[in-house]
Protein backbone atom coordinates (compact mmCIF):
# COMPACT_ATOMS: atom_id res chain seq x y z
CA UNK A 1 0.00 0.00 0.00
CA UNK A 2 2.77 2.44 0.94
CA UNK A 3 4.53 2.05 -2.40
CA UNK A 4 1.62 3.65 -4.26
CA UNK A 5 -0.10 5.81 -1.67
CA UNK A 6 2.85 7.38 0.18
CA UNK A 7 5.89 9.13 -1.36
CA UNK A 8 9.16 7.36 -0.76
CA UNK A 9 12.71 8.55 -0.07
CA UNK A 10 15.73 6.30 -0.50
CA UNK A 11 17.98 8.04 2.04
CA UNK A 12 18.16 6.40 5.48
CA UNK A 13 15.76 7.96 7.99
CA UNK A 14 15.78 7.48 11.77
CA UNK A 15 12.23 6.64 12.80
CA UNK A 16 12.59 7.84 16.41
CA UNK A 17 14.25 10.72 18.25
CA UNK A 18 16.45 10.65 21.32
CA UNK A 19 18.31 7.48 20.30
CA UNK A 20 21.68 8.52 18.91
CA UNK A 21 22.69 4.94 18.15
CA UNK A 22 19.57 4.22 16.14
CA UNK A 23 20.31 3.30 12.53
CA UNK A 24 18.39 4.88 9.69
CA UNK A 25 15.96 2.78 7.68
CA UNK A 26 15.63 2.87 3.93
CA UNK A 27 13.43 3.26 1.98
CA UNK A 28 11.24 5.52 4.11
CA UNK A 29 7.67 6.48 3.28
CA UNK A 30 6.76 10.07 4.07
CA UNK A 31 3.60 10.72 6.07
CA UNK A 32 1.62 11.98 3.10
CA UNK A 33 -1.25 9.78 2.00
CA UNK A 34 -2.69 10.07 -1.51
CA UNK A 35 -5.91 8.26 -2.29
CA UNK A 36 -8.18 8.76 -5.31
CA UNK A 37 -11.18 10.80 -4.19
CA UNK A 38 -10.14 14.25 -5.37
CA UNK A 39 -13.80 15.26 -5.78
CA UNK A 40 -14.61 15.04 -2.07
CA UNK A 41 -11.33 16.68 -1.06
CA UNK A 42 -12.18 19.59 -3.34
CA UNK A 43 -15.79 19.72 -2.06
CA UNK A 44 -14.55 19.94 1.54
CA UNK A 45 -12.02 22.62 0.54
CA UNK A 46 -14.77 24.71 -1.02
CA UNK A 47 -16.86 24.45 2.16
CA UNK A 48 -14.18 24.34 4.84
CA UNK A 49 -15.56 27.32 6.75
CA UNK A 50 -19.05 25.82 6.98
CA UNK A 51 -17.51 22.50 8.03
CA UNK A 52 -15.11 24.13 10.53
CA UNK A 53 -12.07 22.70 8.76
CA UNK A 54 -8.84 24.40 9.87
CA UNK A 55 -6.52 22.98 7.18
CA UNK A 56 -4.93 25.62 4.96
CA UNK A 57 -5.44 26.11 1.24
CA UNK A 58 -1.85 24.96 0.74
CA UNK A 59 -2.65 21.69 2.54
CA UNK A 60 -5.63 21.10 0.29
CA UNK A 61 -3.67 21.99 -2.84
CA UNK A 62 -0.83 19.60 -2.01
CA UNK A 63 -3.29 16.80 -1.19
CA UNK A 64 -5.17 17.32 -4.45
CA UNK A 65 -1.91 17.37 -6.42
CA UNK A 66 -0.75 14.12 -4.80
CA UNK A 67 -4.16 12.52 -5.37
CA UNK A 68 -4.22 13.47 -9.04
CA UNK A 69 -0.66 12.21 -9.54
CA UNK A 70 -1.62 8.91 -7.94
CA UNK A 71 -4.64 8.55 -10.21
CA UNK A 72 -2.74 9.48 -13.35
CA UNK A 73 0.45 7.50 -12.90
CA UNK A 74 -0.13 4.64 -10.42
CA UNK A 75 -3.53 3.35 -11.45
CA UNK A 76 -4.09 2.11 -14.98
CA UNK A 77 -2.40 1.66 -18.34
CA UNK A 78 -4.37 2.02 -21.58
CA UNK A 79 -3.15 0.67 -24.93
CA UNK A 80 -5.10 0.99 -28.16
CA UNK A 81 -4.38 -1.57 -30.90
CA UNK A 82 -3.89 -0.80 -34.56
CA UNK A 83 -7.23 -0.92 -36.38
CA UNK A 84 -8.74 -3.84 -38.27
CA UNK A 85 -11.00 -2.92 -41.16
CA UNK A 86 -14.06 -4.93 -42.21
CA UNK A 87 -15.53 -3.48 -45.40
CA UNK A 88 -17.18 -0.25 -44.17
CA UNK A 89 -16.39 -0.69 -40.47
CA UNK A 90 -13.34 -0.56 -38.24
CA UNK A 91 -12.35 -2.51 -35.15
CA UNK A 92 -10.08 -1.65 -32.23
CA UNK A 93 -8.93 -3.44 -29.11
CA UNK A 94 -8.42 -1.35 -25.99
CA UNK A 95 -6.31 -3.14 -23.38
CA UNK A 96 -6.61 -1.76 -19.85
CA UNK A 97 -4.10 -3.02 -17.29
CA UNK A 98 -4.52 -2.48 -13.56
CA UNK A 99 -1.30 -1.11 -12.04
CA UNK A 100 -2.54 -1.14 -8.45
CA UNK A 101 -2.58 -3.92 -5.85
CA UNK A 102 -6.38 -4.04 -5.58
CA UNK A 103 -9.41 -3.84 -7.83
CA UNK A 104 -9.84 -0.67 -9.82
CA UNK A 105 -11.84 1.26 -8.89
CA UNK A 106 -11.85 0.31 -5.22
CA UNK A 107 -13.26 1.56 -1.93
CA UNK A 108 -16.76 2.98 -1.53
CA UNK A 109 -19.14 1.47 -4.12
CA UNK A 110 -20.11 4.82 -5.64
CA UNK A 111 -16.77 4.96 -7.41
CA UNK A 112 -16.60 4.08 -11.07
CA UNK A 113 -14.29 4.26 -14.08
CA UNK A 114 -15.69 5.16 -17.50
CA UNK A 115 -14.15 4.56 -20.91
CA UNK A 116 -14.68 7.40 -23.37
CA UNK A 117 -14.00 6.23 -26.93
CA UNK A 118 -14.17 8.63 -29.86
CA UNK A 119 -13.58 8.56 -33.61
CA UNK A 120 -12.96 12.01 -35.08
CA UNK A 121 -12.94 12.92 -38.78
CA UNK A 122 -10.14 14.98 -40.31
CA UNK A 123 -12.37 18.09 -40.21
CA UNK A 124 -13.08 17.64 -36.49
CA UNK A 125 -16.55 16.09 -36.83
CA UNK A 126 -17.37 13.22 -34.48
CA UNK A 127 -17.91 9.89 -36.26
CA UNK A 128 -18.49 7.86 -33.08
CA UNK A 129 -18.60 8.64 -29.38
CA UNK A 130 -19.23 6.39 -26.38
CA UNK A 131 -19.05 7.42 -22.74
CA UNK A 132 -19.00 11.22 -22.93
CA UNK A 133 -20.13 13.36 -19.98
CA UNK A 134 -22.56 16.24 -19.76
CA UNK A 135 -22.02 19.39 -17.68
CA UNK A 136 -23.31 17.70 -14.51
CA UNK A 137 -20.75 14.92 -14.74
CA UNK A 138 -23.28 12.30 -15.83
CA UNK A 139 -22.74 10.01 -18.80
CA UNK A 140 -24.69 11.06 -21.88
CA UNK A 141 -27.68 8.74 -22.47
CA UNK A 142 -27.10 7.06 -19.11
CA UNK A 143 -30.34 5.78 -17.59
CA UNK A 144 -29.15 5.57 -14.00
CA UNK A 145 -29.53 1.79 -13.88
CA UNK A 146 -27.02 -1.02 -14.10
CA UNK A 147 -25.01 -0.78 -17.33
CA UNK A 148 -23.89 -4.30 -18.27
CA UNK A 149 -20.25 -5.15 -18.77
CA UNK A 150 -19.34 -5.06 -22.47
CA UNK A 151 -16.83 -7.27 -24.22
CA UNK A 152 -17.76 -5.81 -27.63
CA UNK A 153 -19.14 -2.29 -28.18
CA UNK A 154 -20.90 -1.45 -31.44
CA UNK A 155 -23.22 1.40 -30.45
CA UNK A 156 -22.86 4.85 -28.89
CA UNK A 157 -25.45 3.79 -26.31
CA UNK A 158 -23.07 1.13 -25.00
CA UNK A 159 -20.57 2.42 -22.46
CA UNK A 160 -17.90 0.48 -20.62
CA UNK A 161 -18.22 1.33 -16.93
CA UNK A 162 -16.07 -0.46 -14.36
CA UNK A 163 -17.97 -0.49 -11.07
CA UNK A 164 -19.67 -2.49 -8.34
CA UNK A 165 -23.47 -2.22 -8.25
CA UNK A 166 -25.49 -3.27 -5.20
CA UNK A 167 -28.96 -4.81 -5.08
CA UNK A 168 -31.48 -4.97 -2.24
CA UNK A 169 -33.32 -8.08 -1.01
CA UNK A 170 -35.61 -7.89 -4.04
CA UNK A 171 -32.68 -7.71 -6.45
CA UNK A 172 -33.38 -4.06 -7.27
CA UNK A 173 -30.52 -1.60 -7.69
CA UNK A 174 -29.78 0.45 -4.59
CA UNK A 175 -27.19 2.96 -3.45
CA UNK A 176 -28.07 2.72 0.25
CA UNK A 177 -25.59 0.55 2.12
CA UNK A 178 -28.12 -0.60 4.72
CA UNK A 179 -30.33 -2.02 1.96
CA UNK A 180 -27.53 -3.79 0.09
CA UNK A 181 -28.00 -7.56 -0.05
CA UNK A 182 -26.45 -8.81 -3.31
CA UNK A 183 -23.99 -7.81 -6.00
CA UNK A 184 -25.72 -7.02 -9.29
CA UNK A 185 -22.47 -6.28 -11.07
CA UNK A 186 -18.78 -6.20 -10.23
CA UNK A 187 -16.51 -5.80 -13.24
CA UNK A 188 -13.88 -3.73 -11.49
CA UNK A 189 -10.53 -4.67 -13.02
CA UNK A 190 -8.71 -7.08 -10.69
CA UNK A 191 -5.04 -6.73 -9.81
CA UNK A 192 -2.31 -8.91 -11.29
CA UNK A 193 -2.53 -12.45 -9.92
CA UNK A 194 -6.20 -12.33 -8.94
CA UNK A 195 -7.97 -15.69 -9.51
CA UNK A 196 -11.23 -17.36 -8.53
CA UNK A 197 -9.28 -20.06 -6.68
CA UNK A 198 -8.53 -17.91 -3.64
CA UNK A 199 -10.16 -18.92 -0.36
CA UNK A 200 -11.78 -15.48 -0.02
CA UNK A 201 -13.02 -15.24 -3.60
CA UNK A 202 -16.67 -15.36 -2.51
CA UNK A 203 -16.26 -11.92 -0.89
CA UNK A 204 -14.70 -10.29 -3.96
CA UNK A 205 -16.26 -12.16 -6.88
CA UNK A 206 -16.46 -10.96 -10.45
CA UNK A 207 -20.21 -10.60 -11.03
CA UNK A 208 -22.14 -10.28 -14.27
CA UNK A 209 -21.04 -10.52 -17.88
CA UNK A 210 -17.39 -9.88 -16.99
CA UNK A 211 -17.26 -13.34 -15.42
CA UNK A 212 -17.74 -14.95 -18.85
CA UNK A 213 -15.68 -12.41 -20.80
CA UNK A 214 -12.84 -14.46 -22.32
CA UNK A 215 -10.22 -11.73 -21.91
CA UNK A 216 -11.34 -10.18 -18.62
CA UNK A 217 -8.48 -11.05 -16.23
CA UNK A 218 -7.71 -14.00 -18.51
CA UNK A 219 -5.30 -15.02 -21.25
CA UNK A 220 -6.73 -18.22 -22.66
CA UNK A 221 -7.27 -20.54 -19.71
CA UNK A 222 -4.86 -18.64 -17.48
CA UNK A 223 -6.35 -16.26 -14.91
CA UNK A 224 -4.72 -13.32 -13.18
CA UNK A 225 -3.68 -11.02 -16.03
CA UNK A 226 -5.03 -7.99 -14.18
CA UNK A 227 -6.43 -6.50 -17.36
CA UNK A 228 -9.44 -6.29 -19.63
CA UNK A 229 -9.66 -5.91 -23.40
CA UNK A 230 -12.62 -3.98 -24.78
CA UNK A 231 -13.42 -4.62 -28.45
CA UNK A 232 -14.90 -1.78 -30.50
CA UNK A 233 -16.63 -2.49 -33.84
CA UNK A 234 -17.72 0.76 -35.46
CA UNK A 235 -19.51 1.42 -38.75
CA UNK A 236 -17.89 4.17 -40.82
CA UNK A 237 -21.11 4.73 -42.81
CA UNK A 238 -19.33 5.49 -46.05
CA UNK A 239 -16.79 7.91 -44.60
CA UNK A 240 -13.71 7.82 -46.84
CA UNK A 241 -11.30 10.30 -45.23
CA UNK A 242 -8.70 9.95 -42.53
CA UNK A 243 -9.74 9.83 -38.87
CA UNK A 244 -8.41 9.67 -35.33
CA UNK A 245 -9.28 7.16 -32.59
CA UNK A 246 -9.04 8.28 -28.96
CA UNK A 247 -9.62 6.22 -25.81
CA UNK A 248 -9.60 7.80 -22.36
CA UNK A 249 -10.48 6.35 -18.97
CA UNK A 250 -11.93 8.65 -16.31
CA UNK A 251 -12.43 8.10 -12.60
CA UNK A 252 -15.52 9.45 -10.84
CA UNK A 253 -15.99 9.23 -7.08
CA UNK A 254 -19.61 10.41 -6.69
CA UNK A 255 -21.72 10.09 -9.87
CA UNK A 256 -24.92 12.18 -10.00
CA UNK A 257 -27.14 9.09 -10.26
CA UNK A 258 -25.67 7.75 -7.03
CA UNK A 259 -27.54 10.47 -5.13
CA UNK A 260 -30.97 9.75 -6.64
CA UNK A 261 -32.16 7.80 -3.60
CA UNK A 262 -30.57 10.29 -1.21
CA UNK A 263 -32.56 13.12 -2.80
CA UNK A 264 -35.82 11.43 -1.74
CA UNK A 265 -34.84 11.85 1.92
CA UNK A 266 -35.03 14.95 4.10
CA UNK A 267 -32.54 15.66 6.87
CA UNK A 268 -30.36 18.69 7.68
CA UNK A 269 -27.13 16.78 7.03
CA UNK A 270 -28.42 15.39 3.73
CA UNK A 271 -29.71 18.75 2.55
CA UNK A 272 -26.44 20.44 3.46
CA UNK A 273 -24.39 17.85 1.59
CA UNK A 274 -26.62 18.00 -1.51
CA UNK A 275 -26.29 21.77 -1.60
CA UNK A 276 -22.51 21.48 -1.48
CA UNK A 277 -22.56 18.71 -4.09
CA UNK A 278 -24.68 20.66 -6.55
CA UNK A 279 -22.35 23.66 -6.35
CA UNK A 280 -19.15 21.64 -6.85
CA UNK A 281 -17.80 20.95 -10.35
CA UNK A 282 -18.13 17.20 -10.87
CA UNK A 283 -15.39 16.81 -13.45
CA UNK A 284 -14.18 13.18 -13.71
CA UNK A 285 -10.43 12.71 -13.35
CA UNK A 286 -8.40 11.42 -16.29
CA UNK A 287 -6.63 8.18 -15.38
CA UNK A 288 -5.22 6.83 -18.65
CA UNK A 289 -5.54 7.20 -22.40
CA UNK A 290 -4.20 6.37 -25.82
CA UNK A 291 -4.85 7.54 -29.38
CA UNK A 292 -4.13 6.70 -33.01
CA UNK A 293 -4.20 9.33 -35.74
CA UNK A 294 -4.23 9.54 -39.54
CA UNK A 295 -6.14 6.29 -39.95
CA UNK A 296 -7.91 5.36 -43.18
CA UNK A 297 -9.89 2.42 -44.48
CA UNK A 298 -7.73 0.68 -47.13
CA UNK A 299 -10.85 0.29 -49.29
CA UNK A 300 -10.95 4.07 -49.64
CA UNK A 301 -7.26 4.69 -50.20
CA UNK A 302 -7.78 4.81 -53.95
CA UNK A 303 -10.24 7.69 -53.57
CA UNK A 304 -7.54 9.90 -52.07
CA UNK A 305 -5.15 11.84 -54.23
CA UNK A 306 -2.04 10.84 -52.35
CA UNK A 307 0.96 13.01 -53.02
CA UNK A 308 4.43 11.53 -52.89
CA UNK A 309 6.32 12.16 -49.65
CA UNK A 310 8.71 15.08 -49.50
CA UNK A 311 12.09 14.50 -47.82
CA UNK A 312 14.12 17.41 -46.47
CA UNK A 313 16.78 18.55 -46.14
CA UNK A 314 18.08 16.65 -49.14
CA UNK A 315 21.07 16.39 -49.17
CA UNK A 316 21.46 16.04 -45.41
CA UNK A 317 24.31 15.25 -43.08
CA UNK A 318 24.57 11.57 -42.23
CA UNK A 319 24.34 12.11 -38.47
CA UNK A 320 21.42 14.55 -38.59
CA UNK A 321 18.76 12.38 -40.19
CA UNK A 322 16.00 13.91 -42.30
CA UNK A 323 12.33 14.84 -42.19
CA UNK A 324 9.41 13.59 -44.27
CA UNK A 325 6.20 15.42 -45.09
CA UNK A 326 3.38 13.00 -45.93
CA UNK A 327 -0.39 13.27 -45.67
CA UNK A 328 -0.92 9.79 -44.15
CA UNK A 329 0.61 7.85 -41.31
CA UNK A 330 3.17 5.53 -42.95
CA UNK A 331 2.87 1.82 -42.25
CA UNK A 332 6.48 1.05 -43.14
CA UNK A 333 9.58 3.10 -43.86
CA UNK A 334 12.64 1.33 -45.24
CA UNK A 335 15.94 2.65 -46.53
CA UNK A 336 18.18 0.72 -48.93
CA UNK A 337 21.67 1.25 -50.26
CA UNK A 338 22.06 1.24 -54.04
CA UNK A 339 23.35 -2.33 -53.71
CA UNK A 340 20.04 -3.38 -52.10
CA UNK A 341 21.14 -3.61 -48.46
CA UNK A 342 18.47 -2.53 -45.96
CA UNK A 343 19.81 0.03 -43.49
CA UNK A 344 18.90 0.26 -39.78
CA UNK A 345 16.74 3.26 -38.89
CA UNK A 346 14.24 4.71 -36.43
CA UNK A 347 11.42 7.17 -37.03
CA UNK A 348 8.99 9.24 -35.02
CA UNK A 349 6.35 11.90 -35.56
CA UNK A 350 7.27 15.54 -35.05
CA UNK A 351 4.97 18.01 -33.30
CA UNK A 352 4.18 19.71 -36.63
CA UNK A 353 2.84 16.50 -38.18
CA UNK A 354 5.95 15.63 -40.18
CA UNK A 355 8.12 12.59 -39.53
CA UNK A 356 11.79 12.46 -38.53
CA UNK A 357 13.94 9.58 -39.70
CA UNK A 358 17.28 8.71 -38.09
CA UNK A 359 19.47 6.57 -40.30
CA UNK A 360 22.55 4.59 -39.30
CA UNK A 361 24.51 4.81 -42.54
CA UNK A 362 27.65 6.28 -44.04
CA UNK A 363 27.63 9.08 -46.57
CA UNK A 364 26.19 8.10 -49.93
CA UNK A 365 23.00 7.81 -51.98
CA UNK A 366 20.10 5.77 -50.61
CA UNK A 367 16.57 4.78 -51.62
CA UNK A 368 13.77 5.57 -49.16
CA UNK A 369 10.66 3.38 -49.45
CA UNK A 370 7.39 4.42 -47.77
CA UNK A 371 4.38 2.07 -47.68
CA UNK A 372 0.77 2.80 -46.80
CA UNK A 373 -2.37 0.76 -47.59
CA UNK A 374 -0.76 -1.24 -50.37
CA UNK A 375 0.94 1.74 -52.04
CA UNK A 376 4.69 2.26 -52.13
CA UNK A 377 6.56 5.49 -52.74
CA UNK A 378 10.31 5.45 -53.41
CA UNK A 379 12.70 8.38 -53.59
CA UNK A 380 16.42 9.00 -53.39
CA UNK A 381 18.15 10.84 -50.60
CA UNK A 382 21.78 11.91 -50.39
CA UNK A 383 23.73 11.69 -47.14
CA UNK A 384 26.83 13.89 -47.05
CA UNK A 385 29.76 13.55 -44.64
CA UNK A 386 29.52 15.36 -41.30
Name each region found by the language model:
Residues 1-214, 219-225, 230-237, 245-296:
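Primarily the internal scaffold of c-type cytochrome electron-transfer domains
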Residues 110-112, 326-331:
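Short proline/glycine-enriched turn/loop motifs at strand-loop junctions of beta-rich domains
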Residues 320-322, 341, 345, 358-386:
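C-terminal tail/sorting-segment detector
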Amino acid sequence: CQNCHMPQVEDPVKIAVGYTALLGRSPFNLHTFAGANSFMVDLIRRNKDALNIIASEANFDSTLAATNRNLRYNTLNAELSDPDFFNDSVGFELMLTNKSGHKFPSGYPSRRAIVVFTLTAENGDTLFSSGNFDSSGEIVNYGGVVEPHHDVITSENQVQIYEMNMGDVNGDFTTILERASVHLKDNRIPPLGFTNQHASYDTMRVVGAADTDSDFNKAGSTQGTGRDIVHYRIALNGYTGTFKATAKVYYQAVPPAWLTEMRTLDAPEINSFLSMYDEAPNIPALVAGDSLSELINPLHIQSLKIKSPVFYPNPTRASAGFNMQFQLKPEKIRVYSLSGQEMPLSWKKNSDGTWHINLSAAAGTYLVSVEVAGKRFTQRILLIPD
